Amino acid sequence: RAKVAQTKKKKWDTCFKYGSLLTTLSQGYMLGIWVTGLRTDLYAQGFALLSAFGVTAAYAFIGACWLILKTEGDLQRKAIYWAKRCLSILAGGIIAVSFLNLTLHEEVRALWLESSLGIVLMAIPITCFGLLALCGGVLQRLPEAGGKGEWLPFALALLVFLLCFAAFGISYYPYIVPGQLTIMDALADANSLRFLLVGTVIVVPCILAYTVMVYRIFAGK
């Protein structure tokens, strides 16, 4: 985009926007299908579509919070507005997905509502919505002079993401395909696992190093 003629930049912007939208909708849809155990009935499709819009709102929310941290002026004010809108959609999506999730798998419902860990696990959604409420309060006060508090929305968004990931992990462990395939069932031959381990040891540090480098390049406003 940076190297094309000015008259073509808008087309590139459109491609980036709709490409990103398609990617997030697809990721959310596939997550929803995975949660249902790869079902294809109407109920599962509806849940997957809800998941698609919820994941898109989540990405838009954390992206807007990142812009609040990295920008100033008119763009920052727009980012604050976007974050407020997306926060409401995200909160509604989390509530809907959480309740529907309990209807999909008996094991998940029993874990959250009937097991001895239920009270402890309920701390996750309570904390999650507490963080969203706190983030909403912070967004109402922004922007403040001197950039005070502009880092808080992104930090709170990260915590919300981590809690949602934790809830999913706890709910569906040890399944790779919920209700059908466990980690132990899917284990490959020991030699194959050793090969994957070597690749992981090489690739993961490279990804982390690249991520750190990118954050350093784009540090500051």
Whereabouts are the PLM-identified features?
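Transmembrane helix-loop-helix
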Residues: 1, 94-159
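Membrane-interface helix-loop-helix junctions at boundaries between adjacent transmembrane segments
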Residues: 1-55
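Membrane-interfacial helix termini and the short, flexible loops that connect transmembrane helices
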Residues: 1-12, 69-77, 131-149, 219-221
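Hydrophobic alpha-helical transmembrane segments in multi-pass integral membrane proteins
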Residues: 23-36, 92-103, 162-179
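Membrane-interface helix termini and inter-helical loops of multi-pass transporters
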Residues: 34-43, 103-114, 179-185
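Loop-centered beta-sheet repeat module
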Residues: 39-86
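Hydrophobic alpha-helical transmembrane segments
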Residues: 52, 123-128, 194-207
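Short, membrane-exposed interhelical loops at transmembrane-helix boundaries
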Residues: 177-196
